[in-house]
Amino acid sequence: MFIQMIQGPCTRQDEARQLLDEWRRDLAPGATGWLGGTNGFTDDGQLIGVVRFESREAAMANSNRPEQGEWAAKMAEVMDGPMEFHDCDDVTLLFDGGSDDAGFVQIIRGRVDDPSRLKAMMTTDTTQLHEMRPEILGGTLAIEADGSFIETVAFTNEADARKGEQIEPPEDVRRELDYAMQGATYYDLHRPWFESA
């Protein structure tokens, strides 16, 4: 799997949402290898999209379509500033990945010097995590070449997510969390929406 994260300031949110809906309706059918996406606006007006493709080649082929270029130009017009793009070939799934049933999504951006340690945290003893935090439906961990990461976590709802945050994990888990999340930035999507192929 390949993940591209797109982020930028946007106060014209209704227009941006309409354009994203147009992409789903008109362009997605021709986007070979497109798997889906998670989108939302943060409280401070950032539009975030986490888009999944089968491979980098599929994502690049989509970017090179003329109709994609035309759509991107329209999208740029409703943004308040330039958009950031982050491309990640290194993707790890938490449980079965994200969930289109999520009522709340948290995007975490950070950087680690040992990505394998972070990936191990996502895949080791997920049974214990599921028992401790049943409100977590799944997620994806996307890592860039420099160790920067984008973790997307899907929750049943925000109230249960906040309650779950108060649960103190075992000491070894706490140690790994402290390592991974040191200096990380959290983006809350209170009203996320989803697209799937």
Identify the meaning behind each predicted range.
Residues 1-48, 52-197:
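Short S/T/G/P-rich N-terminal loop/turn motif that feeds into the first structured element of a domain
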